[in-house]
Amino acid sequence: MLLFCPGCGNGLIVEEGQRCHRFACNTCPYVHNITRKVTNRKYPKLKEVDDVLGGAAAWENVDSTAEPCPKCEHPRAYFMQLQTRSADEPMTTFYKCCNAQCGHRWRD
């Protein structure tokens, strides 16, 4: 937790005083004695994970192939190919199970 000096706006440091710890400013003579335990927790809001494959819309007009699903053993899967690495390496094939109850995704 970072507190700022009300006089000059610089960050306050914690130092030992004669009777207790205190917040003190290195620039001006401002001092604030700490009389109780000071805690403050803030949890950042996590943003939603972006679907790098474009979400559900990316799978609307793709072809299917005879690739069995490793999860439910359905005999067909939708597929698309994307260039995920440098141009001199082969494209990565992404699969999605054709079984609507499964929908498992994997890559080759």
Swiss-Prot record:
Give the ZnF (TFIIS-type) ranges: 65-107
Question: What SUPFAM superfamilies does the record tag this protein with?
Answer: Zinc beta-ribbon
GO cellular component terms, alphabetically, are: DNA-directed RNA polymerase complex; nucleus
Places the protein is found: Nucleus
| Ranges annotated as C4-type zinc finger | 5-28
Q: Which UniProt keywords apply?
A: Antiviral defense, DNA-directed RNA polymerase, Immunity, Innate immunity, Metal-binding, Nucleus, Transcription, Zinc, Zinc-finger
Q: Where does Zn(2+) 1 bind?
A: C5, C8, C25, C28
Gene Ontology biological process: defense response to virus; DNA-templated transcription; innate immune response
Query: Keyword Secreted: yes or no?
Result: no
Task: Indicate which residues the UniProt annotation says bind Zn(2+) 2.
Answer: C69, C72, C98, C102
Reading the lineage from the top rank, the first entry is Eukaryota
PROSITE patterns reported for this sequence: RNA_POL_M_15KD, ZF_TFIIS_1, ZF_TFIIS_2
Q: Where is this motif: Hairpin?
A: 88-89
| InterPro entries to which the protein is assigned, alphabetical | DNA-dir_RNA_pol-M_15_CS (IPR019761), Rpa12/Rpb9/Rpc10/TFS (IPR012164), Zn_ribbon_RPB9 (IPR001529), Zn_ribbon_RPC11_C (IPR034014), Znf_TFIIS (IPR001222)
Major location (coarse): nucleus
Q: Which GO terms describe its molecular function?
A: DNA-directed RNA polymerase activity; nucleic acid binding; zinc ion binding
Presence of keyword Zinc: yes
Family, according to the entry, reads as follows: Belongs to the archaeal RpoM/eukaryotic RPA12/RPB9/RPC11 RNA polymerase family.
Q: What is known of its domains?
A: The TFIIS-type zinc-binding beta-ribbon domain contains an acidic hairpin motif (residues Asp-88, Glu-89) that likely coordinates the nucleophilic water and magnesium to cleave the scissile phosphodiester bond and release the mis-incorporated 5'-ribonucleotides.
PANTHER family per UniProt: DNA-DIRECTED RNA POLYMERASE, DNA-DIRECTED RNA POLYMERASE III SUBUNIT RPC10
Q: What does this protein do?
A: Core component of RNA polymerase III (Pol III) which synthesizes small non-coding RNAs using the four ribonucleoside triphosphates as substrates. Can mediate Pol I proofreading of the nascent RNA transcript. Anchors into the Pol III active site to constantly monitor transcription fidelity, cleaves mis-incorporated 5'-ribonucleotides and restarts the transcription process. Once Pol III reaches the poly(dT) termination signal, can induce Pol III clamp opening and transcription termination.
What interactions and quaternary structure are annotated?
Component of the RNA polymerase III complex consisting of 17 subunits: a ten-subunit horseshoe-shaped catalytic core composed of POLR3A/RPC1, POLR3B/RPC2, POLR1C/RPAC1, POLR1D/RPAC2, POLR3K/RPC10, POLR2E/RPABC1, POLR2F/RPABC2, POLR2H/RPABC3, POLR2K/RPABC4 and POLR2L/RPABC5; a mobile stalk composed of two subunits POLR3H/RPC8 and CRCP/RPC9, protruding from the core and functioning primarily in transcription initiation; and additional subunits homologous to general transcription factors of the RNA polymerase II machinery, POLR3C/RPC3-POLR3F/RPC6-POLR3G/RPC7 heterotrimer required for transcription initiation and POLR3D/RPC4-POLR3E/RPC5 heterodimer involved in both transcription initiation and termination.
UniProt protein name: DNA-directed RNA polymerase III subunit RPC10
Organism annotation: Mus musculus (Mouse)
